[in-house]
C-alpha cells in the first residue's frame, strides 16, 4: 500500500434541530397550553486512533465528513432526535491541525484514543420553554445553532524510540535489516529508501525498541532538495538519533563534510530536533583494517569536535551491532518518556444547559411585545407560519 503521511479533510458537525411552536388541542380541554418540544442536538465529528492503519491514503480520496443534523422538535413536547456522530479512524501517531488557525488540536498517540474535532450545534427551544404566568400562549421558539466546520490537516508521524540519520547510502536500511525483521530495499545507488520504515529490535523476551529509517539527507534539504526534509518530522518523537557515517564513502566524499551537512540541515529544520540526543555511529568498518578504521574514526570525531562516545560497526557483517543495540536499550530504559503536560488532551467542557436556556429566554423577553395579545386568530403571523410548518 502506498505510504501517505499528509492529508487535508473537511469536517462539518450537524446543526441543532429547531424548536417547535405547538399547542395542545383536545376535546373538552379548551386551554391546553403550549406543547412544542425542543429540537435535537447536532451530531459531533470524532477522530479515533487505530493501530491497524498505517497510512492516510484513504483521505486522499474521501475528503469531506458531515455529521447528521438534529431533528426538529414536535408537538406533545416531543424532543427531536439527536444527530448521529461521525467517527474518522486514523493511524496511531497522527497529528490533527486546524488549518484555519494553525492550532494543533491533538496528537493521536494511543490505540483507541478519541478526539473531538467538530462539535454539533445546540438544540433550539420549543414554545413550552417560554410559558409564564403572564404569557400563557407563547408563540416563540429558537432555532438550533450551526455545528462546527473546520478544514483539518492530518500529519502522520511515526512512533519510534530510535531514529536513523545519515546521507544517502550511509547504510541505514542495511542496519535496520540487520537488527529487525523489517526488510527495506537496499541497493548501491542514492535514495534507495523512498518512504520511512519501522523495525522492532527485540533484545530478549521482555526488552525491545522501535527504530525508524527515513530517506537520506543531502545538502539543501531544508530548502526542499532531496527527499529527507519531508520525512524529518517522523523523528520528532524519537528519544535518540543514530547518526550513521560512511567511514569510507565509495564516491570519495569527505565524511566530515557529510556529517556537518546532516547537522546543519537538522538545525535549519528544527532546533528541538537538533537538540535531541544524537549518537555518532561509523558504519562499513569491514571495508578497512581494524587499526585504520579506528584511526580514521578518531580523526573524524576530532574534526567534528565530538567528545562523547562513538561506535564503529558494520551493518552488513553485524560487527559491533549487538553492543550498539544494547547500549540503546539501556539508554531507553534509563530515560523513560516524560508525559508533557501540554500534550495531554484538554478536559471536555460540559455545556451548561441552564445558562443556555436562561440566555435564550432573556433574549425573547427583550423583544418588543407591546401589541401582544393572548387571543390567537388567523391574522397572527406566527400562527400562519405554524400552519405552514405543520
From Swiss-Prot:
Highest taxon listed in the record's lineage: Bacteria
Chain positions recorded as GTP binding sites: 166-173, 191-195, 213-216, 283-286, 314-316
Domain OBG-type G: 160-333
Pfam families (UniProt xref): GTP1_OBG, MMR_HSR1
GO molecular-function terms, A-Z: GTP binding; GTPase activity; magnesium ion binding
GO cellular component, one term: cytoplasm
Cofactors demanded by this protein: Mg(2+)
Functional summary from the UniProt entry: An essential GTPase which binds GTP, GDP and possibly (p)ppGpp with moderate affinity, with high nucleotide exchange rates and a fairly low GTP hydrolysis rate. Plays a role in control of the cell cycle, stress response, ribosome biogenesis and in those bacteria that undergo differentiation, in morphogenesis control.
Name of this protein: GTPase Obg
Species: Shigella dysenteriae serotype 1 (strain Sd197)
Name of the gene this protein is made from: obg
